[in-house]
Amino acid sequence: MKLSTILVAFVLLIITVILSTPSTNAKALAESNALAVADPEAEPWLGALFSFIRFIAPYVIKAIRFVVQVASKLVKPAKAAIKFAKNIAKDIAEDMAMDFAMDVITGGDDE
């Protein structure tokens, strides 16, 4: 799984949890109503959107920082593991090719 897929899933999980909290919905609705009263020309959903963005921004920033910290700790070992796996795969492929070539030359295993 790619890191971007994990990041998107994590952000969607956070948004789902925050939206499912009743106090969050009530707070956003109250701020939306306050904005609508202050400016009768404003769309109600626009006020709710701005209040939601204002509310969720610190959590998103914290989540991004956490993901960056975790990714920075995992990238170096992952690169080393990938390099090791590539070397092993290369060795195995060379051995298999050598065995196949020997079988073709000798006519197969007649043990």
Swiss-Prot record:
GO terms for cellular component: extracellular region. Residues 21-44 form a propeptide. Transmembrane segments: none annotated. Expressed by the venom gland. Keywords: Antimicrobial, Secreted, Signal. Disulfide bonds: none annotated. Residues 1-20 form the signal peptide. The keyword Isomerase does not apply. It is found in: Secreted. Belongs to the formicidae venom precursor-01 superfamily. May have antimicrobial properties, like most ant linear peptides. This is U-myrmeciitoxin(01)-Mg8b. It comes from Myrmecia gulosa (Red bulldog ant).
